[in-house]
Curated annotation (Swiss-Prot):
Main location: membrane
SUPFAM superfamilies xref list: Cell-division protein ZipA, C-terminal domain
Membrane topology of this protein: Single-pass type I membrane protein
Keywords from the UniProt entry: Cell cycle, Cell division, Cell inner membrane, Cell membrane, Membrane, Transmembrane, Transmembrane helix
GO cellular component: cell division site; plasma membrane
Protein name: Cell division protein ZipA
Ranges of Low complexity composition bias in the record: 90-156
Side of membrane Periplasmic, spans: 1-6
Family: Belongs to the ZipA family.
The organism of origin for this protein: Enterobacter sp. (strain 638)
Topological domains annotated Cytoplasmic: 28-317
Subunit structure: Interacts with FtsZ via their C-terminal domains.
Length: 317
């Protein structure tokens, strides 16, 4: 929009300047032609006046004035020829004035031709092509753009939005961390001795353990090795694993049996089964059952284990 308006203003300004130049040129030419037309008449009038003045001055200089008759006293006896002599002299004397008084031949006057007025031919307006922008010396005043009038937009009131029923989310109750514990007991050889590997492996298998994950033995719910693991058996020597291809040709100071609580099923019943398996292995290899501190197992320690199991069960109930 701004570019179109600016282009229109430039075209209108160029046409106006061109019209002013044409009008000024035509006016000056008309005035100049009228001056040349009046100048010969003035010259002729001035020449005529000058000729009249010259004639008057010549007549004055030559002494042409009023004709006066003077009486001439002639002597008696003078012949007729004597009287004609002065007349001739007088005629000869007055001849120059008459000759000078003759009108001078006037210069041929120039024939004045009627000055023809220049016929104004109708100007056929040619289709104006878009001219190149003319560099005007006058500063172009900035075109004030019409300020947009603020339009009052009538907004229709939005339909009332019915509040959606707020569904109160149930408070998330953080579950307390599950309490866990590990029950540990050991079967070890007597002081200064070690358990025989072959005898130990036979007693472990008789107690229902199966070799499995982590290269240790596990006691499953079923003696044939099916079902979840209830407790496990590891070597007392680090890293606590057994050789999968062991042939019984090894010695060890003992084994460790451990159960994680809570576990599958009844933890107290699983604890009794673990204690029976430890006593069976100890009887077979000639060892003894120790607690988690590798001390002799006592009834007080057994009750402590049972209390720990009950506490975990109640905490997780």
């Amino acid at each position: 929009m701004m570019q179109d308006l600016r282009l229109i203003l430039i075209i209108v300004g160029a046409i106006a300047i061109l019209a002013l130049l044409v009008h000024g040129f035509w006016t000056s030419r008309k005035e100049r032609s009228s001056m040349f037309r009046d100048r010969p008449l003035k010259r002729m009038k001035s020449s005529r006046n000058d000729d009249g003045d010259d004639d008057i001055e010549d007549n004055d200089d030559e002494g042409v004035g009023e004709v006066r008759v003077h009486r001439v006293n002639t002597a008696p006896g003078v012949g007729h020829g004597e009287q004609e002599a002065p007349r001739q002299s007088a005629q000869h004397q007055y001849q120059p004035p008459y000759a000078s008084a003759q009108p001078r031949p006037q210069a041929p006057q120039p024939v004045e031709e009627p000055v023809r007025q220049p016929q104004t031919q109708p100007v056929h307006q040619q289709p104006v092509a878009q001219p190149q922008p003319v560099q005007q010396h006058q500063p172009v005043q900035p075109v004030q753009q019409p300020q947009p009038e603020p339009q009052t937009v009538q907004t229709q009131p939005a339909p009332p939005v019915e509040p959606e029923p707020v569904v109160e989310e149930a408070p998330v109750v953080e579950k307390p961390q599950r309490k866990e514990t590990v029950i540990i007991m050991n079967v070890a050889a007597h002081h200064g001795t070690q358990l025989n590997g072959e005898l130990l492996l036979n007693s472990i298998q008789q107690a229902g353990f199966k070799f499995g994950d982590m290269n240790i033995f596990h006691r499953h719910l079923s003696p044939d090795g099916s079902g979840p693991a209830l407790f496990s058996l590891a070597n007392m020597v680090n890293p606590g694993t057994f050789d999968p291809e062991m042939t019984g040709d090894f010695l060890t100071p003992g084994i460790t049996i451990f159960m994680q609580v809570p576990s599958y099923g009844d933890e107290l019943q699983n604890f009794k089964l673990m204690l029976q398996s430890a006593q069976h292995i100890a009887d077979e290899v000639g060892g003894m059952v120790l607690d988690d501190q590798r001390r002799m197992m006592t009834p007080q320690k057994l009750r402590e284990y049972q209390d720990r199991i009950r506490e975990v069960k109640e905490a997780n109930a």
